UniProtKB/Swiss-Prot annotation:
Modified residues (Phosphoserine): S32, S33, S34, S51, S68, S324, S561, S562, S563
Start-end of Basic and acidic residues biased regions: 15-26
Keywords: GTP-binding, Nucleotide-binding, Phosphoprotein
Protein name: Guanine nucleotide-binding protein-like 1
Record region (Disordered): 1-81, 547-607
Record's compositionally biased regions (Acidic residues): 550-584
Residues noted as binding GTP in the record, renumbered to the chain: 225-228, 367-374, 411-415
Record's compositionally biased regions (Basic residues): 1-14
InterPro entries: G_CP_dom (IPR030378), GNL1-like (IPR043358), GTP-bd (IPR006073), P-loop_NTPase (IPR027417)
Positions bearing Phosphothreonine: T48, T50
Domain writeup: In contrast to other GTP-binding proteins, this family is characterized by a circular permutation of the GTPase motifs described by a G4-G1-G3 pattern.
GO biological process terms on file: DNA damage response
Length: 607
């Protein structure tokens, strides 16, 4: 018997790599040269994410994979509704990396921040959303699902046939998630479309507006959420923009954590988070406006007096809690009934449905990921009933919540509609899970060309010997300078971890601590008019009246917006557990009418 030859761990690792590459039909050694963190993440993702029948001719990348040993006790698959996006090609990723290293960033004008919805979605084009095909009660479940799959494939084929991958944005390729939207629209009497006030055009697909108000004949309420993250003048300008272009809309301003914009704050608070205690959800700005909109829509067909009484109880409870100076327990009022919908509830209903059945109005909450749908429901209920997370795609199936005996809320998972938005903007909008981005550097460059990130964070150019000298910046330089400032180092070689730094900067932008707000067309020319508008003054007063009063604690964040400390680490955006606590980023300071200055962030010695 021949003597056994020594076989090192390095040789074994190389053997396994070659075996995997042969299985994928790739050439031996194609990826052995890439040993960076991003390269290892890409190799791992490509081993787990492959193309399947849900794509036409394009590779699909599945995000938010959950560990599962099969179906749960109720037959629920945790990966059924995960995000499905088209995968960026390796050549495209490498091209963007080179551009991030070489392209010098130039600041853009204020007019570039103005977004026109007609350029984003091109109403009337194939950039639509899939509709449920016609069906009848004579069809079996298998026939119906097969018909829906064929229709969905045709829908994807039309879009990819009309636009190249470079022009298209990320959008949902998972049919199961679109089925959730169909069911929610069929169940609803009123549809809430929740958008982020920093970029509401991104979250407002005109095709959905036409379908809901036209074909379904339902009322659509546009909720401009997170209004505490934008100047009041900009909020009012967006409100009038949507009223002008979509007259059938009911526009409501909302935020779960209102803040008085007249209150000065510490500019160094970007590195701190504000922990809200007790009755934080009961101070939401907007439930009263939403109630008035629903009363105007139902015109007395539903008794909403119980909802008005609940709002009054929440306001009184919040006021009493402020005066006591103690942390309060959860509301002892009527419990909120939560119903998780099963597969049988997902089956289509009849072509005609009784409106306001049994005196109950059903309000469907739809929108893009990470716009705050779950937080809005918590704000309406007055306490935490829905798990929330910074990770887009956190809501995996729709649930119903009885706000009062006559008001039922329906929470739908976030959906990304097809558009022509730059993918970097989608990343900054929180649509794509940051921890799973293959190439985050161009998104950082997109941000830095629109707000002065280098000056705000007091970054020193990595090649600068004289701090006072001017040096051209590229996206890679910004990431390297932030890694040096924060002490982000790779594990073995102790080099600046630019991937982690880019991840950190993107989280600052998504959280609103690096605030990038887009404007409606013509806002730059009429900015003074909007700042002196009566509704702007009214909004400032309203925010000051319902803002938090002494129930916040600030704690410094040790590891700010970091992720991927080791290979194989998954997304660490944990749910905000705890019934009465909520961690939110502390806003930056500002003026009374124009809003806080979103760019006053760090002092030189803060980190």
């Amino acid at each position: 018997m021949p003597r056994k030859k020594p076989f090192s761990v390095k040789q074994k690792k190389k053997q396994l790599q070659d075996k995997r590459e042969r299985k994928r039909g790739l050439q031996d050694g194609l990826r052995s040269s890439s040993n960076s963190r991003s390269g290892s993440r890409e190799r791992r993702e490509e081993q787990t994410d492959t193309s399947d029948g849900e794509s036409v001719t394009h590779h699909i990348r599945r995000l938010n994979q959950q560990p599962s040993q099969g179906l749960g006790p109720r037959g629920y698959d945790p990966n059924r509704y995960r995000l499905h996006f088209e995968r960026d090609s390796r050549e495209e990723v490498e091209r963007r990396k080179r551009a991030a290293r070489e392209q010098v960033l130039q600041p853009v004008s204020a007019e570039v921040l103005e977004l026109d919805i007609r350029e984003v979605y091109q109403p009337g084009s194939v950039l639509d959303f899939p509709r449920r095909p016609p069906w009848s009660y004579e069809m079996s479940k298998e026939q119906l699902m097969s018909q829906e799959e064929r229709s969905f494939q045709e829908y994807l084929g039309k879009i990819h046939g009309a636009y190249s991958s470079e022009k298209l944005s990320y959008f949902e390729h998972n049919l199961e998630t679109w089925r959730q939207l169909w069911r929610v629209l069929e169940m609803s009497d009123i549809v809430l479309l929740i958008t982020d006030i920093r970029h509401p055009v991104v979250n407002f697909p005109p095709a959905l507006y036409e379908y809901v108000t036209g074909e379904l004949g339902l009322a659509l309420v546009l909720v401009l959420n997170k209004v505490d993250l934008a100047p009041p003048a900009l909020v009012v300008a967006w409100k009038h923009y949507f009223h002008q272009h979509y007259p059938q809309l009911h526009v409501v301003l909302f935020t779960s954590f209102p803040r008085d914009p007249r209150t000065p704050q510490d500019p160094s608070s970007v590195l701190k988070k504000s922990r809200r205690r007790g009755r934080g959800w009961t101070r939401a700005l907007g439930p009263e406006q939403l109630l008035r909109a629903c009363e105007a829509i139902t015109v007395g067909k539903v008794d909403l007096s119980s909802w008005r009484e609940k709002i009054a109880r929440d306001v009184a409870g919040a006021t009493w809690g402020n005066g006591s100076g103690e942390e309060e327990e959860e509301d002892d009022g009527p419990a909120v009934l939560v119903e998780q919908q099963t597969d049988s509830a997902m089956e289509p209903t009849g072509p005609t449905r009784e409106r306001y059945k049994d005196g109950v109005v059903t309000i469907g909450c739809v929108g893009f990921p990470n716009v705050g749908k779950s937080s809005l429901i918590n704000g309406l209920v007055g306490r935490k009933v829905v798990s929330v997370s910074r990770t887009p795609g956190h809501t995996r199936y729709f649930q119903t919540y009885f706000l009062t005996p006559s008001v039922k809320l329906c929470d739908c998972p976030g959906l990304i509609f097809p558009s022509l938005l730059p993918r970097q903007l989608q990343v900054l909008a929180g649509i794509y899970p940051i921890a799973q981005i293959q190439e985050p550097y161009t998104a950082v460059g997109y941000l830095a060309s629109r707000i002065p990130v280098q000056a705000l964070l007091h970054l020193r150019h990595p090649e600068a010997e004289d701090p006072s000298a001017e040096h051209p910046w590229c996206a890679w330089d910004i990431c390297e300078a932030w890694a040096e400032k924060r002490g982000y180092k790779t594990a073995k070689a102790a080099r600046n971890d630019v991937y982690r730094a880019a991840n950190s900067l993107l989280r600052l932008a998504v959280d609103g601590r690096l605030s990038l707000c887009f404007h409606p067309p013509g806002y730059s020319e009429q900015k003074g008019t909007w700042e002196s508008h009566p509704e702007t003054t009214e909004l400032v007063v309203l925010q000051g009246r319902v803002g938090p009063a002494g129930d916040e604690e600030e704690e410094e964040e040790e590891e700010l917006s970091s992720s991927c400390e080791e290979e194989g680490e998954e997304d660490r955006d944990a749910d905000e557990e705890g019934e009465g606590d909520e961690d939110t980023p502390t806003s930056a300071p500002g003026s009374s009418l124009a809003g806080r200055n979103p760019y006053a962030l760090l002092g030189e010695d803060e980190c």
